[in-house]
């Protein structure tokens, strides 16, 4: 068993998800983080060690996180920009007076917390999602410009954009505050669109629309997405999972990537986890789907793990609030960004 697998296996307890419809249950209760503990350099809960991953150089609010092929942490951040009531008008158009962010917005950070490279100045308006494809190139979403961009990792230049700059819309050529992007090895692009349209769109490698994924119909569950905030693509299982934030659930669908006579078309419901809190980010590693949630009326902020092969689930890191982005390193260490206070947490399982 590889180290990263062993690290994640330690989470699992006998709880299950199954084919639709299904209810989600959470496992052993843990004490919330004590008042003031969140400001400590390191604090320990029952099953995890949580420390502050403070980069050597100050960066802004981190809206997107990823781990590159070298094992470095990549942070997509907003520099000094803050998303508030002045950022957009009633038609979802970004406030042109704010202009582009002139500072660098992408930081590459070593595991020793040293900022080893920065770029992205003069490109983005309100950074949001980040992923790294199989070739090591970066994909980001900018809710300010209503676009998705591919950035060449070597040149650090935008080489492809989807959506019309600064123009929100709901047709095939426009997005409205897209939140996240996932890219398959064959070049197919999945976009969570997002805060306004609440839909999932699939494009080919050239940016041509292939399919739209709609929310699965489940008993006693909403029939539409409400802020699909994060995506996770599990290619060898032909699954794409959606963090349906305001519906407090994760829904997983066929990704339409397999070939042959038994290929499932894109968007067939596969499984789901419901009533788990407002899910801000999901990421997969070795068939474990890891997620972070925010506070809701019935469920406190926490993280969860789902074994996508067996359906076993568990929760952990209860009380870690205001999270937004998640990345998982090869050794199973998890990195979680918080917007308030603005920082990155490093979470190791005991």
UniProtKB/Swiss-Prot annotation:
PANTHER family: PEPTIDYL-ALPHA-HYDROXYGLYCINE ALPHA-AMIDATING LYASE 1, PEPTIDYL-GLYCINE ALPHA-AMIDATING MONOOXYGENASE. GO terms for cellular component: extracellular region; membrane. The lineage of its organism: Eukaryota, Metazoa, Ecdysozoa, Nematoda, Chromadorea. It catalyses: a [peptide]-C-terminal (2S)-2-hydroxyglycine = a [peptide]-C-terminal amide + glyoxylate. Disulfide bonds join 176-196, 241-252. Probable lyase that catalyzes an essential reaction in C-terminal alpha-amidation of peptides. Mediates the dismutation of the unstable peptidyl(2-hydroxyglycine) intermediate to glyoxylate and the corresponding desglycine peptide amide. C-terminal amidation of peptides such as neuropeptides is essential for full biological activity. InterPro entries: 6-blade_b-propeller_TolB-like, NHL_repeat, PHM/PAL. Pfam families: NHL. Glycans are attached at residue 103. The keyword Plastid does not apply. Its main location: secreted. This is Probable peptidyl-alpha-hydroxyglycine alpha-amidating lyase pgal-1. Belongs to the peptidyl-alpha-hydroxyglycine alpha-amidating lyase family. One of its GO terms (molecular function) is peptidylamidoglycolate lyase activity. It comes from Caenorhabditis elegans. NHL repeats lie at residues 46-90, 113-154, 162-206, 212-256. Keywords: Disulfide bond, Glycoprotein, Lyase, Metal-binding, Repeat, Secreted, Signal, Zinc. Its cofactor is Zn(2+). It comes from the Eukaryota. One of its GO terms (biological process) is peptide metabolic process. Its EC number is 4.3.2.5. The keyword Secreted applies. The gene is pgal-1.
